[in-house]
A protein has these predicted regions:
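Hydrophobic/aromatic-rich alpha-helical bundle segments in the mid-to-C-terminal region
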Residues: 139-149, 163-210, 215, 219-231, ...
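N-terminal intrinsically disordered/low-complexity leader segments
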Residues: 1-28, 218-248
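Amphipathic alpha-helical segments used for helix-helix packing
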Residues: 104, 118-139
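Small-residue (primarily alanine) positions within well-ordered alpha-helices
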Residues: 36-37, 58, 162, 178
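Basic, helix-initiating cap at the start of DNA-binding domains
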Residues: 1-44, 48-57, 74-77
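Short hydrophobic/aromatic patch on the recognition helix
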Residues: 58-69
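Alpha-helical structural segments
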Residues: 28-39, 43, 56-57, 74-97, ...
Length: 248
């Protein structure tokens, strides 16, 4: 057994100023590429994303885009992660400002409807991606399914908190309640985006009230949710966050 020198702490040392500037610039460039790719994916779908297409919309070379991701697959996964982070910020974390129970659950649904309204002209990557990758396997599908599952878990947790507060029947299956709420959003997206039904948002709101009433809850109708087809804050404009949903 040979003697080895003590481990170096070079990796923990701060980068020289020029190195930091290069690192920050590289991170900013990658973030700009992902932002452009997310906007493109909302129009043409995840499957339509390619290194060449993103290079064209960003004005970069293909090799420049490739250097940040290494593959088309990693580019797609990066877009899914970014969409997930922004979705959490605009829908989930905003609702966390409300109290436990029905106020938080209602805020989740209201925020989700606002987001769906904002995506009528661009599309929801969770929904369009499910159509594109439902019969496929691989890392892209896994990343997409993991993001959706994380969000569904957060929704179910909000239902369980409402049950714990005695605002929804504790005998009810929280998975079933969350399933029905999720179904409303899917129906809203289909009716508003594909069928251009101007009453889709109001019908989704009424459906949510019916779900709560059926399971022993009551809800105050929101006043801030825009009507179907009206503009709302675009998802791609929401600041990014890297937190995981809390269990609180």
């Amino acid at each position: 057994m040979t003697d080895r020198p003590p481990p170096s702490n070079v990796e923990s040392l701060p980068l020289p100023e020029p190195g930091r500037r290069v690192l920050i610039k590289g991170q900013q460039t990658k973030a700009a590429i992902i932002d452009a790719a997310l906007g493109l994916a909302s129009q043409i779908g995840l499957e339509g994303l390619s290194i060449g297409a993103v290079a064209e919309v960003t004005g970069m070379s293909k090799s420049g885009v490739f250097a940040h991701f290494g593959s088309r697959e990693e580019l797609q996964i990066s877009v899914i992660r970014e969409y997930h982070d922004r979705f959490e910020s605009s829908v989930f974390y905003a609702a966390m400002q409300k109290g436990r129970g029905l106020p938080r659950l209602q805020a989740l649904f209201d925020n989700w409807m606002v987001q769906t309204s904002a995506e009528i002209d661009s599309g929801c990557i969770y929904i369009s991606g499910a159509v594109e990758f439902d019969d496929r396997s691989g890392p892209v599908r896994d990343a997409l399914a993991s993001s959706v599952a994380t969000w569904q878990t957060a929704l179910r947790r909000a239902v369980e908190l409402a049950q714990a507060q005695g605002q929804l029947s504790q005998a009810a299956d929280p998975h079933q309640i969350a399933f029905e709420i999720h179904g409303l959003i899917l129906a809203l997206h289909y009716e508003a985006r594909f069928l251009r039904n101007p009453n889709a948002t109001e019908r989704a709101r009424q459906g949510f009230q019916h779900i709560l009433a059926r399971y022993g809850g009551s809800v105050t109708p929101p006043t801030s949710t825009p009507a179907s087809g009206q503009p709302a804050a675009k998802l791609v404009a929401v600041p990014k966050t890297r937190r995981k949903p809390a269990n609180d």
